[in-house]
Curated annotation (Swiss-Prot):
This is Methyltransferase FGSG_00040. It comes from Gibberella zeae (strain ATCC MYA-4620 / CBS 123657 / FGSC 9075 / NRRL 31084 / PH-1) (Wheat head blight fungus). Coiled coil: none annotated. It holds the Pfam family TPR_6. S-adenosyl-L-methionine binds at Y530.
Length: 726
């Protein structure tokens, strides 16, 4: 949905073909035994960070105790060794490309490359905190892979398939144990090192040190102090579930400390449990009334609870927060007007719980996961995600999103059920959520869900709207931007597609705002378009554009396209091109020609359905109306603007210019399609009425504000936009 899919761009097609060829050569070696000295070092140059999604294979759901040991010499290439496990020791410092890598050895001393995919980025967890010499692990059901460059490796796509062991684990072979012994440091000393790492904001290092301090603790008090410190670190690593668990272990039930209560409250806030967070803060302020931080936190919590209850947001504050990078907004979800219900033939969908008016807020949702790709479209160090099975290629935020979701689910398995319930086509998901005390996270399921449910998003929809304004002073274009910033919004993902929907999403940072674009009765399913309608596109081309989601659209627009012949589409294209040339160079001699061409274009549509969108007509009508307004031809300008709105299936009573009522009147009887041009159409109509019928100005301006609200998600900034555009 507005994702920048580059699968059909020539440079990526060529690159995909190269990698597919290499993958096919690797696959032909399936079942071959390992040859001696087969490892080749990787090149340091990597201007394109490409993550290849191989053919899917399920994660291991069997306990390590129930698996049989295997050695590297017994493995076969391109094979998942089901029912097997291998113990490995890290030999070398790590390297990082798209995976975190190091050379490892098995118990017989045979070495091979280990590749861990979907690990946190270097700025969050350095590779040295993921792999370092002498670390020991058990790899369950290992995948022995021949890489696209011919090298051998053990590839790990599912983070739960690997179990890391501390030095005291009696499963570690005796000849590996001496290097694992740590001497001479007590819990207090290790905590001091952890404090130094915290002061340097080296969160992953601090996490490791505080974990060691917990193990080294000689009594309950020492361990509680280390748990409390680690809770703080987990919060800063965006792992609130782990932070909460640590804060609970740091608490003395008989006399909870000030810090432990505060850490619990903060973790509950980040988990979205605002009521429990508030209750925890109440306990804190009762026991420690001098705590000022708790008081400000309570104010913040009351704001969130009010948003959740009323749907009232301070949008200007949200814009201020969206100026930061990444644009993460401190607000909460409001969804009272909608609910999830079964839709016949469409699975789970969103329905209204009450009647809503055009422009009314249906949903304001915080992202489940969000990857901001920045505002630049640089080709250096491009992150690419290539799915070899589907041949789909995405860049930027969508490529990063997979790892972000993987890590979120891995560190909070309670989220897996709701995320895994999103549409995932025919992918068979594992029914086991945890083995060996570790969450089972299927990277291929996550990739499938992210590809089918991800949204492309601007920093703010208002920013995109203003870009259209700055590039097109006639306010006619609706560019259909595609975005590299990407996110998952769980509830909004339930909204099904229609080329002509009844609601529209907009964005302020990682908040998605969905407003009704029409008056919608209670218990009615809501729809928006996953892919904006494209002028002159045939029915077959439209359905091809929707193939990715695996359905055929049967909306009214698609059915009319299906009934329209190729000759009619060609006729429309010729007329529209001729008309555009005239509108690009307006002059007194061209106005009559433009009118004739528009009438001819109108005749290519059936006239017996006033609910049928005429996709190729609204833009020339708006452009011609804006031109006539500039030339003070007010009556005709109003007619053209209204015809443009009617082409977008708005039904409007307007007098003048139509002589259909006893006195001046302007009323939208039925709202139609809400695109970026509609607010300006109503604003231009208000400008016409400023001279033609001043008493109708306020009505036209109100409709402009309502349509602006649909497009950008709020109305607070409409006066600013008006003043900047005048």
């Amino acid at each position: 949905m507005d994702i920048k899919d580059v699968s059909n761009e020539s440079k990526y097609i060529d690159y995909l073909k190269q990698l597919q060829g290499a993958a096919e050569r690797a696959a032909r070696r399936k079942g071959q035994a390992l040859m001696a000295n087969s490892y080749r070092s990787q090149s340091d140059e990597n201007t394109i960070a490409t993550t290849l999604v191989p053919a899917p294979y399920p994660p291991c759901i069997v306990s390590a105790n129930d698996l049989e040991a295997i050695m590297i010499s017994d493995m076969r290439l391109e094979t998942h060794h089901r029912g097997k496990k291998i113990m490995l020791r890290v030999l070398t410092p790590p390297d990082r490309m798209t995976a975190v890598m190091a050379i490892v050895e098995d118990e017989k001393g045979i070495a091979v490359l280990l590749q861990l995919y979907h690990q946190p980025e270097e700025s969050i967890v350095p590779a040295t905190e993921i792999l370092s010499p002498n670390m020991v692990c058990i790899l369950k059901e290992p995948f022995f892979k021949c890489a696209t460059d011919g090298t051998y490796s053990l590839r790990v796509d599912h983070p739960g398939d690997i179990i890391w062991m501390d030095g005291a684990d009696d499963r570690i072979p005796s000849h590996w144990r001496p290097s694992m012994v740590i001497l001479g440091e007590n819990s207090s000393d290790i905590r001091k090192q952890g404090k130094g790492a915290v002061q340097s904001k080296k969160w992953a290092e601090a996490l490791r040190l505080y974990s060691s301090a917990i193990q080294a603790g000689q009594n309950v008090q020492e361990r509680q102090l280390a748990f409390l410190n680690r809770s703080f670190v987990n919060m800063n690593m965006d792992r609130p579930k782990q932070a909460l668990l640590d804060a609970e272990k740091a608490t003395n039930p008989a006399m909870p400390s000030e810090k432990s209560l505060f850490r619990k409250a903060r973790a509950l806030y980040e988990l979205g449990d605002y009521q429990q967070s508030l209750e925890m803060l109440e306990k804190l302020t009762q026991s420690y009334p001098e705590n000022k931080a708790a008081s400000s936190e309570k104010d913040r919590l009351n704001e969130r609870l009010n948003e959740q209850r009323t749907g009232e947001y301070k949008f200007k504050q949200m814009y201020k927060q969206a100026e930061k990078t990444p644009p993460l907004i401190d607000c909460v979800t409001f969804s009272a007007p909608v609910e999830i219900r079964e839709s016949p033939g469409r699975g789970k969908a969103l329905f209204t719980t009450k009647a809503v008016s055009a422009g009314e807020l249906l949903l304001c949702k915080k992202a489940f996961s969000y990857s901001f790709a920045g505002d630049e479209q640089s080709t250096k160090q491009t992150k690419i995600l290539m799915n070899l099975a589907t041949k789909r290629v995405v860049v930027g935020g969508q490529a990063r999103l997979l790892t972000l979701i993987m890590q979120k689910l891995y560190h909070n398995s309670s989220l897996s059920a709701e995320f895994g319930d999103l549409h995932h086509a025919d992918y068979q998901k594992a029914m086991v959520l945890e083995t060996d005390g570790t969450p089972v996270v299927d990277s291929f399921l996550v990739e499938k869900i992210a590809s089918l449910n991800g949204f492309g998003a601007p920093r703010t929809s208002r920013e995109s709207f203003l870009q259209v304004l700055s590039s097109n002073r006639d306010m006619t274009g609706d560019e259909g931007f595609k975005y590299t910033t990407s996110g998952i919004w769980l509830l909004a993902s339930r909204i099904n597609h229609s080329c002509v929907g009844n609601c529209r999403p907009s964005f302020i940072g990682d908040m998605q705002i969905v407003r009704a674009t029409k008056d919608v009765p209670a218990k009615t399913e809501i729809f928006f378009c996953y892919r904006p309608p494209v002028p002159f596109e045939s029915y077959q081309e439209t359905q091809k554009g929707l193939n990715h989601w695996g359905f055929t659209c049967d909306c009214g627009l698609c059915l009319r396209k299906k009934a329209t012949s190729k000759a009619v589409f060609q006729r429309r294209k010729v007329l529209a091109d001729d008309l555009q040339r005239l509108l690009d160079y307006p002059g007194s001699g061209n106005e009559a020609k433009s009118s004739r061409l528009m009438k001819a274009l109108e005749k290519t549509y059936l006239t017996n359905n006033d609910c049928a969108i005429r996709l190729e007509l609204w833009e020339p009508y708006f452009a011609f109306g804006a031109h006539l307004l500039k030339n003070n031809q007010l009556d005709i300008a109003a007619k053209m603007i209204l015809k443009g709105l009617e082409a977008l299936v708005h039904s409007i009573i307007a007098c003048p210019p139509n002589d259909i009522t006893d006195g001046p009147r302007l009323k939208v009887e039925r709202w139609g399609v809400a695109n970026d041009a509609v607010p300006w159409a109503f604003k231009n109509l208000a400008n016409v009425y400023g001279q033609l019928a001043p008493e109708l100005c306020s009505a036209a301006e109100n409709y402009a504000e309502v349509s602006y609200t649909m497009v950008v998600g709020e109305k607070e900034t409409w006066p600013e936009v008006l003043s900047s555009s005048s």
